[in-house]
Amino acid sequence: MRDRGFTLVELLVAMGIVTILATVAVPSYRHAMHRAQRLDARLALQRIQYLQERHYAQYLRYAARLGDNRDSPDSLAMPDRSEAGSYELSLLAGEDGQTFTATAQARVGSRQIDDLSCRQLAIDDAGLQRSADAAGNWSSADPQRCWG
């Protein structure tokens, strides 16, 4: 007559299978989460681009900074954080106000700080989309890697 329960070997085999599945699933889950959170940055940057074009139509120059003053020729009425709070937003305008670059950088303390391949996203007045990895290496060669 056989005792009810599991043998030690059966438990070790089951634990091994669970471990193998976890080593595959956890990185895939993190990658999917990082990719989903990038949408927060992309939407914020596209909103900045839209607001900059409206600002340019009104003042014939791009805004130089983000802020709360809606009627200032130097400020764009938008907060310096993305909606979900995962990214810090910044705006750099050319001295003549005819160019700009908007950047979203993963905020320290957010999950996105662990996004090693796409830690920063940027868009400029011409619509050029760029991204930077954790080391700060910028690239526009394959924008779909981080923007897609």
Task: List each model region and its residues.
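Short, charged low-complexity linear motifs
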Residues: 9-19, 38-47, 133
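Residues at secondary-structure transition points
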Residues: 3, 35-39, 43, 95, ...
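Membrane-proximal N-terminal amphipathic helix
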Residues: 33-61
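Alpha-helical interaction segments
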Residues: 18-20, 45-46, 52, 77, ...
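Detector for the N-terminal beta1/A-loop initiation region of ABC nucleotide-binding domains
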Residues: 14, 32, 107
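Periplasmic/extracellular, small/polar-rich flexible segments of pilin-like filament-forming proteins
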Residues: 57-148
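N-terminal single-pass transmembrane signal-anchor helix
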Residues: 1-29
